[in-house]
């Protein structure tokens, strides 16, 4: 069975309309993950709406509303197999207001494909997504320079090199090692260099997207870290009881384990664990599971709670120290500012009580102690007090629960990681 292959979560990131969904659709289509008759149906539907070129992207779109608008909304979990891995696609939509989806999506990703349209080059969201991917700990990256069929002239090597240079500069700035990142000229729509090398880019001798995916390193599963499962949803299933759903970030969950949910502070015994509607005896990092806990009611826990073992419970912060980088803010950030922190599945308003130091974003060394304010482009060490209880861990101890994004005014203001926690 395919599941004996190692599993990777793959995010597709990049600016809106640069072709992320089309590339995913093309990939799934080429890898035989979609039936021919479904593609045919999509082709007809798209043509009827006057969106003939949307056929592959439609594979990713499951919501009626999205189709009418012609954009991808929710994070779609799709899967396809290569000869080496099986991938779950965490499709990260590109529209501005969907960045917070990306925050929850990208933090689940082992690797990302950055899609940049050759005619446009680097755009605002290209920068934002690269930045977030880096901050959220996505260390493996593949760059697909897409829409090569739309350059002047088509499949122009010069334009490819210009965009490659521009993207390379951006990646270096946030700390990716450029020599480890493959850059691939593609046309997702026509299939050039996605699975097979294209005759239209004879000047390119590097890997296809498929080659690059197979060359990714298998992530080490953090099984030895304490158990942490952020709750995404809670269901009440008749005959079973309360079933929280979430992704195991660290540790191992076994049937019969005594677990506690924080900050709800309720505990119970694990009766059963399910993955894709199949019961399993234990769950490992990366598994998206539903688990039933004896003695816990549907209203006892909610999204944003974190499940851990009773003898090593998740840390509830009274306050914490963090390192952040300000992505964008219309004015300046000073002590007393209370935006919303998105950490794992929790969204909690937190007050920045003190700006301890301003850092050089490239090196991390201190530029200024106790600055009065910080603004776009600055990196800083801050003290934070959540307005209500929330779980956050030191990034050095449990990185998966130590990273966060800060949002306000419908945009991502900053991204950061927790360095120290004062437990409640």
UniProtKB/Swiss-Prot annotation:
InterPro entries: EFTu-like_2, G_TR_CS, GTP-eEF1A_C, P-loop_NTPase, Small_GTP-bd, T_Tr_GTP-bd_dom, TRAFAC_GTPase_members, Transl_B-barrel_sf. GTP binds at residues 14-21, 91-95, 146-149. It holds the Pfam family GTP_EFTU. GO terms for molecular function: GTP binding; GTPase activity; translation elongation factor activity. Residues 5-223 form the tr-type G domain. Mg(2+) binds at residue 21. Residues 187-189 are annotated as: G5. Its EC number is 3.6.5.3. It is an enzyme of class 3 (hydrolase). PROSITE patterns: G_TR_1, G_TR_2. Residues 14-21 are annotated as: G1. It comes from the Archaea. Residues 91-94 are annotated as: G3. GO terms for cellular component: cytoplasm. SUPFAM superfamilies: EF-Tu/eEF-1alpha/eIF2-gamma C-terminal domain (SSF50465), P-loop containing nucleoside triphosphate hydrolases (SSF52540), Translation proteins (SSF50447). Residues 70-74 are annotated as: G2. Residues 146-149 are annotated as: G4. Keywords: Cytoplasm, Elongation factor, GTP-binding, Hydrolase, Magnesium, Metal-binding, Nucleotide-binding, Protein biosynthesis. It is found in: Cytoplasm. Gene3D superfamilies: P-loop containing nucleotide triphosphate hydrolases (3.40.50.300), Translation factors (2.40.30.10). It catalyses: GTP + H2O = GDP + phosphate + H(+). Its main location: cytoplasm. Belongs to the TRAFAC class translation factor GTPase superfamily. Classic translation factor GTPase family. EF-Tu/EF-1A subfamily. NCBIfam families: EF-1_alpha (TIGR00483), PRK12317.1 (NF008969), small_GTP (TIGR00231). GTP hydrolase that promotes the GTP-dependent binding of aminoacyl-tRNA to the A-site of ribosomes during protein biosynthesis. This is Elongation factor 1-alpha. It comes from Methanothrix thermoacetophila (strain DSM 6194 / JCM 14653 / NBRC 101360 / PT) (Methanosaeta thermophila). The lineage of its organism: Archaea, Methanobacteriati, Methanobacteriota, Stenosarchaea group, Methanomicrobia. The gene is tuf.
